[in-house]
């Protein structure tokens, strides 16, 4: 599960903060 979470978290942060 950890690899999936580590992959999703950055995407969520990118969408929320709009800073990629």
Swiss-Prot record:
Is Cytoplasm found in the keyword set? Answer: no
Q: Which residues cross the membrane?
A: none
- Does the keyword Transferase feature in the UniProt annotation? no
The residues forming the signal peptide are: none
Any Gene Ontology CC annotation: extracellular region
UniProt record, GO biological process: defense response to bacterium; innate immune response
Its keywords, alphabetically, are: Amphibian defense peptide, Antibiotic, Antimicrobial, Disulfide bond, Immunity, Innate immunity, Secreted
Which domain of life does the UniProt lineage start with? Eukaryota
Q: What is its main location?
A: secreted
Instruction: State the compartments where it is located.
Output: Secreted
Annotated disulfide bonds: 14-20
Tissues with expression: Expressed by the skin glands.
The record's function comment reads: Antimicrobial peptide.
UniProt record similarity statement: Belongs to the frog skin active peptide (FSAP) family. Brevinin subfamily.
Instruction: Spell out the protein name for this chain.
Output: Brevinin-1LT
- What is the organism field in this record? Rana latastei
Q: What's the source species' lineage?
A: Eukaryota, Metazoa, Chordata, Craniata, Vertebrata
């Amino acid at each position: 599960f950890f690899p999936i979470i580590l992959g999703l978290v950055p995407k969520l942060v990118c969408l929320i903060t709009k800073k990629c």
